[in-house]
């Protein structure tokens, strides 16, 4: 009986640990693609609305992320709104 409880506790611990790794490493990612078509060149608005890119860089706003994508041909997604 005690062995069964110990196994169940270890299984629960392992599942909890694995679930904590999912957002950290982007498994089953819900990253979103920035809508770069809404931003005209040149320049971006100066409003501060930071986004965290999948390259783990914080961008001042979605437009500055789109500029980075355009200049380097990178495929950067938005992990979340706010700084990284």
UniProtKB/Swiss-Prot annotation:
SMART domains listed in its UniProt record: KAZAL
Coiled coil: none
Superkingdom field: Eukaryota
Keyword Chaperone: no
Signal peptide stretch: 1-23
InterPro entries, per the entry: Kazal_dom, Kazal_dom_sf, SPINK2
Gene3D superfamilies: 3.30.60.30
Main location: secreted
UniProt modified residues of type Pyrrolidone carboxylic acid: 24
Cellular compartments annotated: Secreted; Cytoplasmic vesicle, Secretory vesicle, Acrosome
Tissue spec: Expressed in epididymis (at protein level).
GO cellular component, one term: extracellular region
Cystine residue pairs: 36-66, 44-63, 52-84
Site (Reactive bond): 46-47
One GO process term, biological-process aspect: spermatid development
Keyword annotations: Cytoplasmic vesicle, Disulfide bond, Protease inhibitor, Pyrrolidone carboxylic acid, Secreted, Serine protease inhibitor, Signal
GO molecular function, one term: serine-type endopeptidase inhibitor activity
Domain Kazal-like: from-to ranges: 30-84
Pfam families membership: Kazal_1
Function, in words: As a strong inhibitor of acrosin, it is required for normal spermiogenesis. It probably hinders premature activation of proacrosin and other proteases, thus preventing the cascade of events leading to spermiogenesis defects. May be involved in the regulation of serine protease-dependent germ cell apoptosis. It also inhibits trypsin.
PANTHER family in the cross-refs: SERINE PROTEASE INHIBITOR KAZAL-TYPE 2, SERINE PROTEASE INHIBITOR KAZAL-TYPE 2, SPINK2
Disease: Spermatogenic failure 29: An autosomal recessive infertility disorder caused by spermatogenesis defects that result in non-obstructive azoospermia or oligozoospermia. When produced, spermatozoa are immotile and have abnormal morphology, primarily defects of the acrosome and head-neck junction.
Name of protein: Serine protease inhibitor Kazal-type 2
Source organism (scientific name): Homo sapiens
Lineage: Eukaryota, Metazoa, Chordata, Craniata, Vertebrata
């Amino acid at each position: 009986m005690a062995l069964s409880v110990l196994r169940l506790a270890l299984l629960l611990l392992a599942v909890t640990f694995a679930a904590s790794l999912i957002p950290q490493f982007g498994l089953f990612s819900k990253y979103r693609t920035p809508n770069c078509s809404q931003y005209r060149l040149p320049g971006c608005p100066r409003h501060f609305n930071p986004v965290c890119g999948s390259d783990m860089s914080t961008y001042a706003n979605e437009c500055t992320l789109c500029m980075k994508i355009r200049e380097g041909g990178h495929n950067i997604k938005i992990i979340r709104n706010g700084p990284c």
